[in-house]
Amino acid sequence: MRFTVRSIYLLVLISTSLWGKSVQYTLSMSEPHTHLFEVEMRLDGARGTEVVALPVWTPGSYLVREYARNVQDISARSEDDTVLKIKKIDKNHWQVKGKGRQDIIVSYRVYAYEHSVRTSYLNADHALVVPASVLMYWQKNQQRNHQLHINMPENWSEITTALEPFNKPGNVDFIAKDYDELVDSPLELSNQHVVNFEVLGKPHVMALYGASNYDDSVLVSDFTKIIEAETKIFGSLPYDHYSFIFHVEEGRGGLEHANSSVNFIRRWSFNDEKRYKSLLSLVSHEFFHTWNVKRIVPKGVA
């Protein structure tokens, strides 16, 4: 039996998360038309008083966003369903008074109706999850494995993300080695058009939400050229797989992540030469950040 580096990495992550301590999330959207995500966060191995928090910014966009303003209806309980006291101690931190040596479950909702590459968005048709704006962190345990289970509406079938899946079949469970990896991995949930292709021996996926006149073969050909050209500059691809997430609607903009990018493009960008070149420029720019900024950083930031 052959084991790749990636398969060994997954085995280590999954085994430690199943048998060791982890932070576990269930992300639901039972009424997506209300624009409210429902989150349940389990603090495995909590002891006494704990603190959870929501970031104020997201990887790739280094401005204060104040995501905590969208948090609603937060509560906490112990694993035996005892209600626990939880209070907000500053603008984005909450303190939970635990019950001895019992896991703590924190539940809350997040309003998500700001459509941009740096904010989460939910409606009856699809969801863009920017994890930093939805998934809180356990203040003292950000280095643990983080597991994410997703409950989607029954009529949605696709999840596109750079996170590693586990517990197949279904692919609604994902794992990150730590909180940093989790928040650097946005997710698109819907019935988006998905195209899989391979470049330089690595799998890539292109997910497009929104109808337009794009041609899969043309996009794959041009994206392949971009990937190959930029790889020549840096020497090799620094990831095992990569996801391009596109919202094909209005506006233009992108945000880089370690193994993915989120891009907003105009609906009719594909048969107009000027607009199509603008699209390719955006893709090239965001993909360049796979190395520059995401892997090559100032010494004080590393």
Regions found by a protein language model. Name each.
Residues 2-13:
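Sec-dependent signal peptide recognition
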Residues 12-20:
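Hydrophobic h-region of N-terminal signal peptides that target proteins for export
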Residues 29-30, 60-123, 138:
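A surface-exposed beta-strand-loop module
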Residues 37-68, 133-153:
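Surface-exposed beta-strand/loop patches in extracellular or lumenal glycoproteins
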Residues 39-45, 54-56, 95-124, 146-154, ...:
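Short, hydrophobic/aromatic-enriched beta-strand segments in well-ordered soluble domains
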Residues 67-76, 143-160, 171-181, 211-242, ...:
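Zn2+-dependent metallopeptidase catalytic core
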Residues 107-188:
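Extended, low-hydrophobicity, Ser/Thr/Pro/Gly-biased non-transmembrane segments
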Residues 193-302:
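Juxtacatalytic substrate-recognition/specificity segment
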